[in-house]
UniProtKB/Swiss-Prot annotation:
One of its GO terms (molecular function) is structural constituent of ribosome. One of its GO terms (biological process) is translation. Residues 16-90, 108-173, 194-262, 279-348 form the S1 motif domain. This is Small ribosomal subunit protein bS1. The gene is rpsA. Residues 356-381 are annotated as: Disordered. GO terms for cellular component: cytosolic small ribosomal subunit. Keywords: Repeat, Ribonucleoprotein, Ribosomal protein, RNA-binding. PROSITE patterns: S1 (PS50126). It comes from Staphylococcus aureus (strain MRSA252).
Amino acid sequence: MTEEFNESMINDIKEGDKVTGEVQQVEDKQVVVHINGGKFNGIIPISQLSTHHIDSPSEVVKEGDEVEAYVTKVEFDEENETGAYILSRRQLETEKSYSYLQEKLDNNEIIEAKVTEVVKGGLVVDVGQRGFVPASLISTDFIEDFSVFDGQTIRIKVEELDPENNRVILSRKAVEQEENDAKKDQLLQSLNEGDVIDGKVARLTQFGAFIDIGGVDGLVHVSELSHEHVQTPEEVVSIGQDVKVKIKSIDRDTERISLSIKDTLPTPFENIKGQFHENDDIEGVVVRLANFGAFVEIAPGVQGLVHISEIAHKHIGTPGEVLEPGQQVNVKILGIDEENERVSLSIKATLPNEDVVESDPSTTKAYLESEEEDNPTIGDMIGDKLKNLKL
């Protein structure tokens, strides 16, 4: 009889086989399972019931449940012709989990998992087994307190799998980066040169300010911060400040966006509309000399031209004979061209002269209407404030 029993055991279920069965009894430290096609019942110790820590088998199974497990050992008593299959449900769950996670890693897919524990180095998550999100892979942003994730279900990607060492490394940061890139691409496609949009000052450099316009940073060069001359960006804006910007150019391949705050603001000329009138006598400061005349600032950022013929009653060869930058002068407004933002001025009209000569109307008209290259333009009018606008 014993010989027949041993021979039947050879042909029966053996170690390493995968079996199924019905839970017959749930005890304190183990579960008894009726194995389909088996000669004996199976026993699953509590340590082999789940990939997670449990205090009681009843937390994961109940009588009547269908379970699947690996046979880790076959025990039998030859004398009494009885035996049992020692089973591991945990081993099978781990195998399935690694297979699932490997597929997600190969396909670069996102999964969802619940944070079961917050530890010093990161987050412990449930991915069918214990998975770990290191602190460096939690977010693209700095997060001071990781406890905000405790109990939350988060979206993550598989970063590294090492079944031999039971190591599962995951990344929430990779998901955030992917989502940010998608938003960035969508935003870049929606923007057009000339658009005026809202933004927030993200950081400042010597050469300008970077503005966050919804997930993408654009640069406002220092020359595009204001109509007035700016030495450093801090003179005009501060980090976190909400601003309106105009898109000057977009390079979608390099994701470089040039912006302007200045173009969203009234020009200095617009600010003085109604303040000055033709024939007004006002004070100004000589800011620049040219062969054809002198540029005089009559309001912040607004310069008018005193043609060389309007500088003095006597004939002069160059403006530098009687004027120098920084000199305060009295001027009379000869004409205002609001459309082209030009002001024609005269110094000699404010000076006494025994042989007063009327200002030559043709000179004023020539300046206000001139479009020739050698004649002053709006760039001449506000001088070096508009130089070097390239980003």
